[in-house]
Every structure is written in structure tokens, then in C-alpha cells.
Amino acid sequence: MCCGRPLISQGLLDEARRHAALNTDRLHPLARAETPIVFFEPSCLSAIREDAPALVRGELRQRAQQVARHAVLFEELVEETWAAGRGTLPLAPGPSAILLHGHCHQKSMGLVAPAKALLSRVPQARVVDLDAGCCGMAGSFGYTRDHFEVSQAIGERRLLPAARTMPAGSVLVASGMSCRHQVHDFTGVRAVHTAKLLSSLLARPSAGDQA
């Protein structure tokens, strides 16, 4: 089931309200059990955490609010767990520099800071917050013919030039799928999600460790 973000962005609020109700019904048992509901896409998290409670009414709104309280971004959960001493990741040394591009919804929810803190735990890597504003794609905005030039112009302000001039041995991290598409479409650079980068750096057990 879709989070409803595309419907909300297009102003199709009646259909978005139906999605919010369905998602609330499906996710509420997890929230009631105090289980974190982990999202990898900031716009999806925003739809569940911020928009769904406002779209539904009555008792359903109370359940949606409970779901929202247990909805977390991947970077947020891992950094919180690490900082609290409840778990760590055995990371090998990573790229010399990690360029971080925050998704617009990630910024609006104040979740760039935990992403930067988590990436800063990669050994020997320097994390640079590009603070580049919107990538220009804005969900489906940049995919339409009428918005193509505006979308590119927004990206060319900071993000796309930064991608083209990345130092050797560095990597561009972006949690938003639309952001990654925008970067690749205009520069050929393949930005990666934080989870994918961390997965690639997990120290693999040796044969002796497995014995």
C-alpha cells in the first residue's frame, strides 16, 4: 500500500484520506505493540507521521497519531540506538568524503542531523552536509514536461554542480529516491541511500570467526 504522498502532492485528498485510513488500520497493531515502524523514504515517513493524522477523523485520528509516534526514519532509529549504547554496526573504513544531501521532507522533520551523525560514525570518512536546498525533482514535479526546465534550474543551484565536482574517493548520499534520480539523470552520478552505504561497509566475519 502506498503511503499516499503522491496523492497528497497532486491534491487528490479524498483518495489520500482513504489511503491514510487503510495505512492506519494496517500499521496500528505495530504501534500498539510499541514496535518501531521504520521508513527509508523521508516523503513516505512525512505522509504517515505528519499528514495521515490530519486527513482522518474521530477515533481513527487517535490511532493515526499513535502510528505517527512510532514511525521513524532509518537513519533516525540507527543513530538513536547507537547513541544510547543499545547497539552498533561493525563498519569498515569508508570513502574519504561523504557528501550528504538532505531530502526536503527530511529537513522539514529535523532529520538531517541524525543522518549526519550516523554517517560520521563511518571510520576515516569526512561528512559534508551540502545544504543544497531542493534537488528540483520534488516528487513527480520534475518528471512533467512543463516543469522540466524549472526542475533542472533548481538542481543546478548547488546540488548538481556538487555532484559533478565530487572529489575522487567520495560518495554522494541521498535518502530521497527522487533526489537520487535527479542527480543521476543530470550528472550520471549514482547517489546512494545511507542504508546501502552502511551495508557495503559492514565488516564481514572471517573464516576463523565463523568456525
Please place each PLM-identified region on the residue numbering.
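Iron-sulfur cluster-binding electron-transfer modules in prokaryotic oxidoreductases
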Residues: 1-211
